[in-house]
């Protein structure tokens, strides 16, 4: 929770200039830092969108170019079947096609050495590993409407260009309540493995 607060604080105050209704695109694997960034985004009312790192550059551009994000959250690498996959080398191609991105927040893959990035013209680069060193403001969380946009996800793109699907705060909460409590009967201290593509 503290890191989520730090993330939302960084979005607002630390020159990234992200505010309510702004879009944040994430090109990251499922790691705790991704969740912290998502919670930080939702705390200030910005709209989260994400693509799996196994998407190639064209798949990412097809999706994120539709939403015009101000900030791209990206991990430096991920691992598949024991092999290291470098994602950060894809960044220049993404930035070349999505001109609205003004800032990049780089997450380090847990337990691995961070790949630092060379400066990119007209793009501000931030490192998530430095967020914890910032002094965090203790503002009260703002309440948003049931209908407030929370996240934009995408159709598969099998029948043409992927289509944006906007998920609203209230609907996401109701869906999780329904799935977790009614469908799956999840109780405190239960372990859950939820596999999806």
Where are each of the predicted segments found?
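Conserved AMP-binding/adenylate-forming
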Residues: 12-61, 191-197
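Short internal alpha-helix immediately C-terminal to a glycine-rich phosphate-binding loop
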Residues: 9-17, 178-185
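Structural core segment of the AMP-binding/adenylate-forming
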Residues: 15-16, 43-129
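Alpha-helix termination/capping residues and helix-transition junctions
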Residues: 4, 15-18, 66, 97-98, ...
């Amino acid at each position: 929770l503290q890191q989520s607060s730090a993330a939302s604080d960084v979005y607002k105050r630390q020159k990234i200039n992200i505010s309510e209704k702004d879009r944040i695109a994430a090109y990251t694997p499922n790691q705790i830092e991704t969740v912290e960034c998502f919670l930080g985004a939702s705390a200030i009312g910005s709209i989260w969108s994400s693509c799996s790192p196994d998407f190639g550059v064209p798949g990412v551009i097809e999706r994120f170019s539709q939403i015009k994000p101000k900030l791209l959250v990206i991990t430096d690498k991920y691992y598949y079947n024991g092999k290291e996959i470098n994602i950060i080398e894809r960044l220049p191609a993404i930035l070349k096609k999505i001109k609205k991105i003004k800032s990049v927040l780089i997450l380090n893959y847990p337990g691995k050495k961070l790949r630092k990035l060379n400066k990119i013209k007209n793009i501000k680069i931030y490192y998530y590993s430095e967020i914890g060193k910032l002094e965090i403001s203790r503002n009260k969380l703002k309440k948003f409407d049931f209908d407030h946009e929370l996240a934009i996800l995408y159709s598969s793109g099998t029948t043409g260009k992927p289509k944006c699907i906007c998920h609203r705060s209230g609907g996401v909460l109701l869906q999780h309540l329904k799935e977790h409590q009614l469908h799956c009967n999840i109780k405190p201290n239960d372990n859950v493995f939820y596999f999806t593509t």
